[in-house]
């Protein structure tokens, strides 16, 4: 997890690439000399999480063996959870066993992965049980996301303030600030847009940055500009779930068909929340039709 101590941060660029969604760049530039054993484990975690973000679950599962350090075992568990949704109960059961083990249960990476998995499950109370104590920038940032999903902006703001006290310029602090500004809305949307604009000027453009700018544009009613940004993101990754989901919404607002983007999202990410909501709406419609028939 992100170090908060003094001294040179050998993983700064790798971490930054991961946070901003430049996953292949993170993987390609992960050979870093003279890392401490602890930093080497963190490096490997970031590389394997980048592979997970790219959908290469089986590579992660096969590469991390039983003798690997706890943080890597936790990352492997995330890959198993995402790769086989039908077996997620056994994965969650293993996760809970590890969290209950006093020798490893407080490991920062294990707590982070637990938070990510339980957030996927939309079990926010269980998520916070493991993440609320914070301790790393990654955990504080995850807490901001969780509280936003719970519509508790005031708690998200408290977590953000902790991050700002630690490092106001940290990429995760800036991202968390943008997420919160988007959630609050109103005049804060422009502030969020400026954060993503700043990222786009400092770093190579990624789907994450483009989607951030596009969501800001949509919230400000600039759907044509949002569509341009999202199509640029689609050119970078035709299967990126957030790009496809945002294109579905944007297409509806600009009067274009969203069926192709929705079909692609259903095929490549059947567990995505938008797919589930559309399927639920379709089921309700079918039931209503049957009642009328």
Curated annotation (Swiss-Prot):
Matches recorded under SUPFAM superfamilies: TPR-like (SSF48452)
GO BP terms, alphabetized: protein transport; retrograde vesicle-mediated transport, Golgi to endoplasmic reticulum
Cellular compartments annotated: Cytoplasm; Golgi apparatus membrane; Cytoplasmic vesicle, COPI-coated vesicle membrane
Keywords assigned: Cytoplasm, Cytoplasmic vesicle, ER-Golgi transport, Golgi apparatus, Membrane, Protein transport, Transport
Gene Ontology cellular-component terms listed: COPI-coated vesicle membrane; Golgi membrane
Protein name: Coatomer subunit epsilon-2
A Pfam family it matches: Coatomer_E
Membrane protein topology class: Peripheral membrane protein
Membrane-spanning segments: none
GO molecular function annotations of the record: structural molecule activity
Origin species: Arabidopsis thaliana
Subunit and interaction comment: Oligomeric complex that consists of at least the alpha, beta, beta', gamma, delta, epsilon and zeta subunits.
Function per UniProt: The coatomer is a cytosolic protein complex that binds to dilysine motifs and reversibly associates with Golgi non-clathrin-coated vesicles, which further mediate biosynthetic protein transport from the ER, via the Golgi up to the trans Golgi network. The coatomer complex is required for budding from Golgi membranes, and is essential for the retrograde Golgi-to-ER transport of dilysine-tagged proteins.
Family: Belongs to the COPE family.
């Amino acid at each position: 997890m992100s170090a908060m101590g003094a001294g040179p941060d050998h993983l700064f660029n790798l971490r930054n690439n991961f946070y901003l969604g430049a996953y292949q760049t993170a993987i390609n530039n992960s050979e870093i000399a003279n890392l401490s054993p602890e930093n080497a484990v963190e490096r490997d975690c970031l590389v394997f999480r980048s592979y997970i973000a790219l959908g290469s679950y089986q590579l992660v599962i096969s590469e991390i063996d039983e003798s690997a350090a706890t943080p890597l075992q936790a990352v492997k568990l995330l890959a198993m959870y995402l790769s086989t949704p039908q077996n997620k109960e056994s994965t969650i059961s293993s996760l809970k066993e590890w969290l209950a083990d006093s020798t490893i249960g407080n490991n920062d990476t294990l707590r982070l992965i637990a938070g990510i998995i339980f957030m996927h499950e939309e079990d926010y109370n269980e998520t916070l049980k493991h993440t609320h104590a914070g301790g790393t920038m990654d955990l504080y940032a995850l807490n901001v996301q969780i509280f936003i999903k719970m519509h508790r902006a005031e708690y998200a703001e408290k977590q953000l303030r902790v991050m700002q006290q630690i490092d106001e310029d940290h990429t995760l602090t800036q991202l968390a600030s943008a997420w919160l500004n988007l959630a609050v809305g109103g005049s804060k949307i422009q502030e969020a847009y400026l954060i993503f604009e700043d990222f786009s000027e400092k770093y190579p453009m990624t789907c994450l940055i483009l989607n951030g700018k596009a969501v800001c544009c949509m919230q400000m009613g600039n759907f044509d500009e949002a569509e341009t940004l999202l199509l640029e993101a689609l050119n970078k990754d035709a299967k990126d779930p957030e790009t496809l989901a945002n294109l579905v919404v944007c297409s509806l607002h600009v009067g274009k068909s969203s069926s192709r983007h929705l079909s692609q999202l259903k095929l490549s990410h059947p567990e995505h929340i938008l797919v589930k909501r559309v399927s639920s709406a379709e089921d309700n419609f079918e039931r209503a039709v049957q009642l009328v028939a």
